[in-house]
Swiss-Prot record:
PANTHER family: ATP-DEPENDENT CLP PROTEASE PROTEOLYTIC SUBUNIT. The lineage of its organism: Bacteria, Bacillati, Bacillota, Bacilli, Bacillales. Its EC number is 3.4.21.92. The gene is clpP. This is ATP-dependent Clp protease proteolytic subunit. Belongs to the peptidase S14 family. It comes from Staphylococcus epidermidis (strain ATCC 35984 / DSM 28319 / BCRC 17069 / CCUG 31568 / BM 3577 / RP62A). It catalyses: Hydrolysis of proteins to small peptides in the presence of ATP and magnesium. alpha-casein is the usual test substrate. In the absence of ATP, only oligopeptides shorter than five residues are hydrolyzed (such as succinyl-Leu-Tyr-|-NHMec, and Leu-Tyr-Leu-|-Tyr-Trp, in which cleavage of the -Tyr-|-Leu- and -Tyr-|-Trp bonds also occurs). One of its GO terms (biological process) is protein quality control for misfolded or incompletely synthesized proteins.
Length: 194
């Protein structure tokens, strides 16, 4: 069951009910809290474009708690983050795994964060193929090219060498928030404000 809280906002013109995500969007906050597929990517991209149209100078905040998902859907979000004018701050809450960690690293340099108990997981892209041998070969070549592209971008975003990225993503590689900072996936571990 998917329960989405409602927030009641009272103004001098009366009361208005918002679902929590719409209310957060008013504060330029976007939540990525699920597996990344085309529908999720279209929603995130739409929100990014909407917020840029509202104000192209103010930062946008992308909170990430995601196990990852589709590489092509993730690239749609990544490319939009790089394309729009406002800086996108990325904040890992819970877990940013696979394409979720890639999007975490996609934030504006100096504005990529994780909460102290958050985890980040990087690995190579997953894929499968079936059919005739030539079709399997085509799919295998495609996933290798995709891996090279992901490794190149992660190298640019983290400052790690492509060789190190390739070695570190050969298998699931889980990092604490502090380790993600040391690796260059994030810039700071957020400390409690209390």
């Amino acid at each position: 069951m998917n329960l989405i809280p409602t927030v009641i906002e009272t103004t001098n013109r009366g009361e208005r009910a918002y679902d929590i995500y719409s209310r957060l969007l008013k504060d330029r906050i976007i939540m990525l809290g699920s597996q990344i597929d085309d529908n999720v990517a279209n929603s995130i991209v739409s929100q990014l474009l909407f917020l840029q149209a509202q104000d192209s100078e103010k930062d946008i905040y992308l909170y990430i708690n995601s196990p990852g998902g589709s590489v092509t859907a993730g690239f749609a979000i990544y490319d939009t983050i790089q394309h729009i004018k406002p800086d996108v701050q990325t904040i890992c809450i819970g877990m940013a795994a696979s394409m979720g960690s890639f999007l975490l690293a996609a934030g504006a340099k100096g504005k990529r964060f994780a909460l102290p108990n958050a985890e980040v997981m990087i690995h190579q892209p997953l894929g499968g193929a079936q059919g005739q041998a030539t079709e399997i070969e085509i799919a295998a070549n495609h996933i290798l090219k995709t891996r090279e592209k992901l490794n190149r971008i992660l190298s640019e975003r983290t400052g790690q060498s492509i060789e190190k990225i390739q070695q570190d993503t050969d298998r699931d590689n889980f990092l604490t928030a502090a380790e993600a900072k040391e690796y260059g996936l994030i810039d700071e571990v957020m400390e409690p404000e209390k």
